[in-house]
């Protein structure tokens, strides 16, 4: 199966299925000498792992990562970094009833037509279980970016119809929703409790921000930084839309409002989301991603079987009623992977470029 590797100089390849024995990743291109420990990776994996609250799937996976190669005496060697996470809580029997059926809004139907067969257990390769390896790889990228003063972090900005105002980063790690507003957490909890009683699911919006990114990252035309970010973020399971900066709100803006004017003291706004002409401007890079409602719900849905006969499908098993609740670390990981890849590409081509024009921040 192609399409399992992302990046050009900093590359991430993942493999593994939801109910297989393990998930694996190969991270290649990480510069040598970076101090790296299991704790660096486990910290983000624990933020993503299932079963951490009543609002997520109750599948219990420790998601304990093993580093198989590429690290010696606590430092990266420059060789490929092999990573492994063992699956320990599969319940494949939950899916035996749907092995010949197609769940609505899942990848069952499309995988069947593409490959002629599919791993029906928990969605197989199409499951968001795969994103655990992205988070592990992204933790490596985040660690390297941090040595250059670049910080990547995210938060939930909307849960279903509830918009979440940004108040403080301090709140994000203090609740199960990654909400930046501590005051609205009870409302989010009540909404999810009712959703569970209704046996339904809901979507979410995640915002991810990179600060400290220098100007100059990104390539013209096809490898624009915003295009690469959209590619990476859209590759996350359940993501149906990506915005950079003001995004679709730009449609209603006038040019006098949308343009980010420059002054000697800094930019006056950041509607561009930190990217101009596909190249980073030095402002914070801001992206938003929309995740659809979970398709695995117990309410019967109309579908067909492999013979084309009409059936009603009820999805059993353990599922997230809102995949967006655990998506923040995944979005951070993908943004970090993109930024490190482009940082290394920029360094390879333009390391000798010197510009006397000052780097502007945002007022």
Swiss-Prot record:
Record-listed FMN binding positions: 125-127, 237-238, 277, 292-296, 318
Catalytic activity from the UniProt record: 5-O-(1-carboxyvinyl)-3-phosphoshikimate = chorismate + phosphate
Pathway the protein takes part in: Metabolic intermediate biosynthesis; chorismate biosynthesis; chorismate from D-erythrose 4-phosphate and phosphoenolpyruvate: step 7/7
GO MF annotation: an example: chorismate synthase activity
Chain segments annotated as transmembrane: none
CDD domains registered for this protein in UniProt: Chorismate_synthase
GO annotation, biological process: amino acid biosynthetic process; aromatic amino acid family biosynthetic process; chorismate biosynthetic process
Enzyme Commission no: 4.2.3.5
Keyword Lyase: yes
Pfam families in UniProt: Chorismate_synt (PF01264)
Cofactor: FMNH2
Enzyme class: lyase
Family: Belongs to the chorismate synthase family.
Subunit text: Homotetramer.
UniProt function note: This reaction introduces a second double bond into the aromatic ring system.
Protein name: Chorismate synthase
Species lineage: Bacteria, Pseudomonadati, Pseudomonadota, Gammaproteobacteria, Pseudomonadales
